[in-house]
């Protein structure tokens, strides 16, 4: 079972860039591992650091600004997560500490992979995202309340509605990944296997 996502309140960091691809999110040289942990250290590596080894932080990159340390909600522009279909991208985001990404649109494969990894991708219109960028930049350190059950983002004095597919919403709220969904039918699977001839088991 994965961690359930129902509501989250977190610090928001504004990444004011469109078409952020998966190679920017987690560069290919860090993809050797097959476990989900450890990728956060290399999130946005080529932007966060001035050296290849990731030891010299880039002071001009927003994730390195002191006021955004500990951010768990990423505000971005359109077509977030485009490029190759590596699942390491949501792994890196969640390992870094992000729970939510808000953007006008997402690449389809990244969007699906996010749900599989309990990272909530929230789609809002360009105009609403513009409002949120203005709000965050005027109020560094602001927190948003994200309510998956109500499908709402509360930011400042305003509430923004979003829509998530009912099945994906159910899975996130109940902490069900692909394995968890399969285990829900464990008894039925065991019963089926018992009925099979011995040579097929």
From Swiss-Prot:
Membrane spanning stretches: none
Keyword Ion transport set for record: no
EC number(s) per entry: 4.2.1.33
GO molecular function, one term: 3-isopropylmalate dehydratase activity
Highest taxon listed in the record's lineage: Bacteria
Annotated pathway: Amino-acid biosynthesis; L-leucine biosynthesis; L-leucine from 3-methyl-2-oxobutanoate: step 2/4
Oligomer and partners: Heterodimer of LeuC and LeuD.
Name of the protein this chain belongs to: 3-isopropylmalate dehydratase small subunit
Originating gene: leuD
